[in-house]
Regions:
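Flexible "cap/lid" subdomain of the alpha/beta-hydrolase fold that forms the substrate-access gate
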Residues: 26-45, 52-60, 89, 93, ...
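Conserved HGGG/HGGXW glycine-rich cap/lid loop of the alpha/beta-hydrolase fold
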Residues: 59-102
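N-terminal export signals
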Residues: 5-24
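Conserved acidic functional residues
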Residues: 71, 138, 308-309
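Catalytic histidine-centered segment of alpha/beta-hydrolase-like enzymes
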Residues: 302-310
Length: 324
């Protein structure tokens, strides 16, 4: 099924307008830290043995922990541009969720958001990390909200980018993906063709590309293979990719608002304005809901997976939040 059809089935793309106070991002000229490559990830990937399975993760730095939660159908490679810069300040840990990336789990293991939260706790325990600064995107943002609601003592700060909210989870644009996954067809009909044809993957009809990225040529071939290759590598991995999508409904954040309103964790929201998957009202909703919100920064023209395209911006926002 095509991305265009997904949007048509979900009432079409939302018309976007310039929002007062939006920030136009200018790329940094700082070249002190480089973006990690797939080879770097393969060479340094570690596995934590937990009751949930072998959790794949990449780690950089020392000191206090910072945890990076990726989107769907991505994995920790999404954060390759921020790990080195922020490793000067934090022990940066970027895991692959259950059912995604290079994490290895059994056929019967749940990959639902609640299971992801408990997996994260087990991972942190295995690494002797008591508390973390959270940075999250997309479905990783839902997991982050569940984490701070359930384990507030284990989070110091929260940086949310375009992601689910209780009022928009799963968003209408994702409903057709979920239905396709329920039929057991998402991986075969959507992911497999995108791995075989990288130009298709980058197009508006592919698994990634112009719907999720604003910069032409993104994601590159290396990223597509790293993201999607593991998900189509076996019948089990295909079924787990389907299961991840299915588990996005019913709303995993139902009833969480009251808990988030009691949250004392400093929170910052950074939102791409060209995202037509999540509601444009969501950043203000999050700002109102978290009592210790540090406000919203809007990135004009940025789409769902913009943290991957603007790592220096994410690093800047993280450092500002951590120092506040």
């Amino acid at each position: 099924m095509e991305r265009r059809r997904f949007l048509e089935l979900s009432a079409g793309a939302v018309a976007l307008s310039v929002i007062n106070g939006c920030t136009r991002h200018k790329p940094s000229t700082d070249t002190t830290h480089r973006t990690l490559t797939a080879s770097d990830y393969h060479a340094t990937r570690r596995f934590a043995e937990t009751k949930f399975g072998r959790i794949a993760y990449v780690e950089r730095g020392t000191a206090d922990g910072a945890l990076f939660l990726h989107g769907f159908p991505l994995n920790s490679f999404q954060w390759r541009g921020v790990l080195d810069p922020l490793s000067v300040h934090r022990r940066c840990v970027a895991p692959d969720f259950l059912g995604l990336g290079f994490t290895e789990v059994s056929e019967n293991q749940s990959v639902a958001p609640n299971a992801q939260v408990e997996m994260i706790v087990a991972l942190l325990d295995s690494l002797s990390i008591k508390s973390v600064d959270l940075i999250a995107n997309d479905s990783g943002g839902a997991v982050a909200q569940l984490f701070v609601a359930r384990y507030p003592q284990r989070a110091r700060t929260l940086l949310l980018t375009n992601c689910d909210t209780e009022r928009d989870s799963p968003p209408p644009a994702v409903h057709p993906v979920i239905e396709l996954a329920r039929a057991g067809k998402f991986a075969d009909e959507f992911l497999v063709p995108s791995v075989a044809d990288k130009a298709l993957a980058r197009s508006e009809n592919g698994a990634l590309g112009s719907l999720c990225y604003s910069k032409p040529g993104n994601p590159n071939d290396e990223a597509i293979d790293y993201y999607l290759g593991p998900l189509v590598s076996s019948p089990l991995r295909k079924s787990q990719a389907n299961a991840y999508a299915v588990a996005l409904a019913p709303n995993p954040l139902a009833g969480i608002e009251a808990e988030l309103r009691r949250c004392t964790i400093p929170t910052r929201i950074v939102w791409g304005t060209a995202d037509n998957i999540f509601s444009s009202a969501s950043p203000d909703y999050l700002d109102r809901t978290f009592p210790h919100s540090r406000g919203v920064r809007r990135i004009v023209g940025a789409k769902l997976f913009f943290p991957e395209e603007y790592p220096e911006l994410i690093a800047e926002e993280a450092l500002t939040l951590w120092r506040a």
